[in-house]
Curated annotation (Swiss-Prot):
Gene: plsX
Lineage: Bacteria, Bacillati, Bacillota, Bacilli, Bacillales
GO process terms (BP): fatty acid biosynthetic process; phospholipid biosynthetic process
EC number(s) stated in the UniProt entry for this protein: 2.3.1.274
Entry annotated with the keyword Aminoacyl-tRNA synthetase: no
Reported function: Catalyzes the reversible formation of acyl-phosphate (acyl-PO(4)) from acyl-[acyl-carrier-protein] (acyl-ACP). This enzyme utilizes acyl-ACP as fatty acyl donor, but not acyl-CoA.
HAMAP family attached to this UniProt entry: PlsX
Family: Belongs to the PlsX family.
Catalytic activity: a fatty acyl-[ACP] + phosphate = an acyl phosphate + holo-[ACP]
Name this protein carries in UniProt: Phosphate acyltransferase
Length: 332
C-alpha cells in the first residue's frame, strides 16, 4: 500500500509532515510513502529513507490562493502532483494539511467522483465523552444540499463507521434544532422522511448540544451547518482548556492542586483531542483523500496516515461504489 503525502501543506510543513510520516513507517510495516514537495527542503528532515519516495514539486498552493484557479494553474504544486499520484494509480490514498478548498477541488477533478454520488462530503471524526467518537458530515464540501444528498452522506458515513470504527449497525442522526420528528426547516423535514424510510439505522433528529454525549455514530447535515457545528466544538474545547489552565495556575494552592490532578487532566485532554482520530475524509471520491488540520503536528499526521491506511485496507471507497450501484439498479 502506498500513500501520497503533501509535504508542503500546513503551518508546520515540511518538518511536522515528515516526522509524522517517519513515525507511521515505524508503526506500519505494510505501507510506503510518496512525499510530494520541494526535494531540497524535504531531504534534510529524513532520517531513514526506507520505504520513502520523494516526488519533487517546486510550487506550493498557499492558504490564500483561490482554490479552483490554484489547482488549474499550479500544475507543479505539491498538492496537484499528490492527487495525480492517486488518479494515475501510483498511490492508493493521499493526505494534505494544505488549503482545504484546493484539496477538495483536486480531489473532485483529479482523483474523481464515484459515479452515482451527487456531492462529495467532508467528514471529520470528533471525540465523544466515552472515547468512541462520531462522524460529522458534511462540514463544508457543499454549503447547500438537497435531502437526497444528506441520505447519501448517511450511507457513506455508515459504511465508514461500520468498517473503520468499527461499529456494528451504526446509529445515524440528523442534526436539527430539536429532537421531535417535525422539527426543522424544509431540508431537514424531507431528509427525516427519507432517512426513516431507508435501511439505515436512523435514530432521528439530534441536537448539537448532545453530540459529544455520543447520541449517534454518524451525524449528517448540510456543509454550512456542519462547518458551524465543527468550529463551535473546536472553539469551545479550546476555551475550556484555556480557562482550566488559567484557573489552575492562578495561585500557589491552585498549582499544587493542578500537580495532583495532572494525570487526570492529561487523560481528559487526550480523550478530547480530535487529532487522535485522524483528519477529515472526503467521501464520495474514487480513492481516499484526507484533509489533515492546517496546524497538524507530527502526531496528527501520523493519525491521518493511520486513517488513510484503514480506509484503503477496509475497501471503504469500493464498498461505497458498490452500494451506489446497487441503489441505482433498484431505482431503475
Amino acid at each position: 500500500m502506498r500513500i501520497a503525502v503533501d509535504a508542503m501543506g500546513g503551518d508546520h510543513a515540511p518538518k511536522a509532515i515528515i516526522d509524522g510520516v517517519q513515525k507511521s513507517l515505524t508503526a506500519f510495516s505494510d505501507i510506503e510513502i510518496t512525499l510530494v514537495g520541494d526535494e531540497s527542503k524535504i531531504k534534510p528532515y529524513i532520517t531513514n529513507n526506507e520505504r520513502i519516495t520523494i516526488l519533487d514539486a517546486k510550487e506550493v498552493i498557499e492558504p490564500t490562493d483561490e482554490p479552483v484557479r490554484a489547482v488549474r494553474r499550479k500544475k507543479d504544486s505539491s498538492m496537484v502532483k499528490m492527487a495525480q499520484e492517486v488518479s494515475e494509480g501510483r498511490a492508493d490514498a493521499c493526505i494534505s494539511a494544505g488549503n482545504t478548498g484546493a484539496l477538495m477541488t483536486a480531489g473532485l477533478f483529479i482523483v474523481g467522483r464515484i459515479d452515482g454520488i451527487d456531492r462529495p462530503a467532508l467528514a471529520p471524526t470528533l471525540p465523544t465523552l466515552d472515547g468512541s467518537g462520531f462522524l460529522l458530515l458534511d462540514v463544508g464540501a457543499n454549503v447547500d444540499a438537497k435531502p437526497e444528498h444528506l441520505v447519501q452522506y448517511a450511507m457513506m458515513g455508515s459504511i465508514y463507521a461500520e468498517r473503520v470504527f468499527p461499529k456494528s449497525n451504526p446509529r445515524v442522526g440528523l442534526l436539527n434544532v430539536g429532537t421531535e420528528d417535525k422539527k426543522g426547516n424544509d431540508l431537514t423535514k424531507k431528509t427525516f422522511e427519507l432517512l426513516k424510510a431507508s435501511d439505515l439505522n436512523f435514530v432521528g433528529n439530534v441536537e448539537s448540544r448532545d453530540l459529544l454525549e455520543g447520541v449517534a455514530d454518524v451525524v449528517v447535515t448540510d456543509g454550512f451547518t456542519g462547518n458551524i457545528a465543527l468550529k463551535t466544538i473546536e472553539g469551545t474545547a479550546l476555551s475550556v482548556f484555556k480557562m482550566l489552565k488559567e484557573t489552575l495556575t492562578s495561585s500557589f494552592t491552585a498549582k499544587i492542586a493542578a500537580g495532583m490532578m495532572k494525570p487526570k487532566l492529561m487523560q481528559m485532554k487526550s480523550k478530547m483531542d480530535y487529532s487522535e482520530y485522524g483528519g477529515a475524509a472526503l467521501f464520495g471520491l474514487k480513492a481516499p483523500v484526507i484533509k489533515a488540520h492546517g496546524s497538524s503536528d507530527e502526531n496528527a499526521i501520523f493519525h491521518a496516515i493511520r486513517q488513510a491506511r484503514d480506509i484503503v485496507e477496509k475497501d471503504v471507497s469500493a464498498i461505497i461504489h458498490q452500494e451506489v450501484q446497487k441503489e441505482t439498479t433498484n431505482e431503475s
